[in-house]
Amino acid sequence: MGGAGLTSRARLVKGVTAVVAAVLASMGLASATGADPVIGGKTVLKPDRDTFEGLADMSIGVEATGAATFRRSGAKFPIKGGDVKGGPKGSIEHRGGLAFFTEGGPGVKFSKFTIRIGKRKVKLFAKSGRSEVRFLDLDLGDATIGGSEGVKLRIKGADAGLAKQGAEVLSDVFDFPFRKGIPVGVVNVKAQLG
C-alpha cells in the first residue's frame, strides 16, 4: 500500500512539473537564461583606412572568404545563430571570414566569427587553423545600441581593435610585430531574433 501511495505521489509531482514547464514555456520563461535565439542578419566591418593602407604597403592583402563579401561599405558577414538577452549579453555566430595573404608567400585565414557580448567586454573570436583565437576586441563606448526586445538587435559604430591573440597569429605568419590594439575598423551589427 505504501508503494502504491508513493507511485501516486510520484505521478502527481511529475504531472505538476509538466504543467509548470508548459506554463513557463507559454510565458517565454522556459529558458534559464531568458535569451532569445539569433536567427539571421549581418555584421559589417568598415575597415580602418590607415591600417589597411599600411597592410597594402607591406604587400599584405585582405579578402573575404566563404559566405563573407567585400563591398564598398566594408566586409559583410552573414549571421547564422547565437543567443542574446537583455543588456545586451550573449553570442552572435557568423559565416565566412577574412584571409590575410601575400602573393606567393605566407597567409592566414580567420573564419567562423563569434561575437561574445559580456558585462564589461565584447570580444570577437575566430577559428584560425585548428584553434579558436580572440581575434578582435570591440569597444561599445561610442556605439549606439538599439532594436526591439525579442525581435532585433542593432549595434552601430563599435570600434574594433586587434586582440592580443589575433596579433600573435599575424606576427607569427608574417614575421612582423603586430601589436594588440591596432585599429581594424568599425563594426555594425544587425541581428534578427526569434
Each model region followed by its residue ranges:
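Generic alpha-helix signal with a bias toward terminal, lower-confidence helices
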Residues: 18, 24, 28, 57, ...
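Poly-acidic low-complexity segments
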Residues: 46-48, 116, 139
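Predominantly extracellular/secreted and cell-surface proteins with exposed
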Residues: 65-134
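Extended amphipathic ligand-handling, pore-lining, and cofactor/metal-binding catalytic surfaces
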Residues: 132-165
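Solvent-exposed, well-ordered amphipathic alpha-helical segments
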Residues: 4, 119, 193-194
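Secretory targeting and sorting signals
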Residues: 2-33
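N-terminal segment immediately downstream of the Sec signal-peptide cleavage site
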Residues: 32-89, 159-194
